[in-house]
């Protein structure tokens, strides 16, 4: 916002922003784009990828076929990208890079959400320990580096270093050493770009608040229970006072809208204050500083309270636990079947070496949608 109160419509990059003209490059050399920046090209490649389209049929919390209005990984990624762009514009960093990271952050997610990821990781560690485990964050990087097959001259999407690094929210030292330059910050304990920090926090804002919406729609949590959560109770009371005749469904939507706005406004103000305190003059200064993007202490407590409420009351609800048990069995039985007899796999996923075969199986399962995994399981284990 300008001094006269008008909203900034064009984002003039700050000195501490990631500059697309100064990118650290791509894994494979390419001519520069003619009518886009390097980060815009990354964003566009992500949107046009097969992995991005498959997110439409992958779970956020509820299995994909359970309801048309529940969020999927695709709708979640779009919501994260919208919040991330808003934050990037306010802090005068690259909207395109922030958006690209936000859109790509879940490309490596398995079917069935975190339940599928946890079970696939357990299978890899128990049944193929020589191959290493499975982590969706690393898988997202693997998707954009190796697994996408769209271009004649290289595997993957050949994204910029800054986008690839931003996709990695966390990484063990062992994996970081294997990844080379993109994993260096996990070894020298420096920070990612401000764009990556904002995309990460936008993810948190989106899933916490939108899981409240989906939880209420499903009937697994209630308005009465949410009165125990400070940030929800405060905004819901404000909405009830101002709009006493409003139907509960619309009052809830208005409450969630206000909660998201509270988090974005606080995150923006707190991050700008940290930037003023540390005065980074370049993107490299951002890396050497403490985390510059974040919530105030008070709002962080409220966000953590909401997160704990969702964990205790939604993610551990008995109906969710029942579905978790079912989908974990599907993932495990698929993995065991393919590992026991690789001839069951499509030819492109068969490998000579055992550790390579296990990784190819995890790639195959991780790339499945919820519906495809269920159908594949039926084809293998049901008669008819």
From Swiss-Prot:
Basic and acidic residues bias locations: 28-39
Ranges for domain HD: 73-208
Gene Ontology process terms (BP): dGTP catabolic process
Annotated signal peptide: none
Spans annotated as Disordered: 12-39
UniProt-listed Pfam families: HD, HD_assoc
Keyword set, alphabetical order: Hydrolase
Listed GO MF terms: dGTPase activity
Annotated NCBIfam families: dGTP_triPase, PRK01286.1-1
Family membership noted in the UniProt record: Belongs to the dGTPase family. Type 2 subfamily.
Protein name: Deoxyguanosinetriphosphate triphosphohydrolase-like protein
């Amino acid at each position: 916002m300008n001094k006269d109160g008008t909203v900034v419509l064009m984002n003039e990059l700050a000195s501490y922003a990631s500059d697309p003209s100064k990118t650290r490059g791509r894994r494979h050399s390419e001519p520069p784009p003619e009518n886009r920046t390097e980060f815009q090209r990354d964003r566009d490649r992500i949107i046009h990828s097969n992995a991005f389209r498959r997110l439409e049929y992958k779970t956020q919390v509820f299995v994909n076929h359970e309801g048309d209005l529940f969020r999927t990984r695709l709708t979640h990624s779009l919501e994260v990208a919208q919040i991330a762009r808003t934050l990037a514009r306010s802090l005068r960093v690259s909207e395109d890079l922030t958006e690209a990271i936000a859109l790509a952050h879940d490309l490596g997610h398995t079917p069935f959400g975190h339940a599928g990821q946890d079970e696939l990781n357990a299978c890899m560690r128990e049944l193929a320990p020589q191959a290493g485990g499975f982590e969706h964050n690393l898988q997202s990087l693997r998707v954009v580096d190796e697994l996408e097959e769209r271009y004649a001259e290289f595997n993957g999407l050949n994204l910029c270093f800054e986008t690839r690094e931003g996709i990695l929210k966390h990484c063990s030292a062992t994996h970081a050493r294997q990844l080379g330059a993109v994993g260096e910050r996990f070894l020298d304990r420096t920070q990612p770009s401000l764009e990556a920090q904002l995309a990460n926090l936008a993810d948190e804002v989106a899933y916490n608040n939108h899981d409240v919406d989906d939880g209420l729609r499903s009937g697994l949590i209630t308005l009465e229970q949410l009165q125990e959560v400070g940030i929800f109770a405060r905004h819901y009371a404000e909405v009830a006072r101002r709009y006493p005749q409003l139907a509960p469904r619309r009052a809830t939507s208005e409450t969630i809208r206000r909660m998201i706005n509270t988090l974005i406004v606080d995150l923006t103000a707190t991050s700008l204050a940290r930037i003023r305190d540390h005065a980074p003059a370049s993107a490299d200064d951002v890396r050497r500083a403490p985390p510059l993007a974040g919530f105030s202490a008070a709002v962080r407590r409220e966000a953590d309270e909401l997160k704990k409420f969702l964990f205790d009351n939604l993610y551990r609800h008995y109906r969710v636990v029942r579905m978790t048990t079912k989908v974990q069995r599907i993932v495990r039985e698929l993995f065991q079947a393919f590992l026991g007899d690789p001839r069951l796999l499509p030819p492109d996923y068969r490998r000579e070496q055992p550790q390579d075969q296990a990784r190819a199986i995890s790639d195959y399962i991780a790339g499945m949608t919820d519906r495809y995994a269920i159908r594949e399981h039926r084809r293998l284990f049901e008669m008819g």
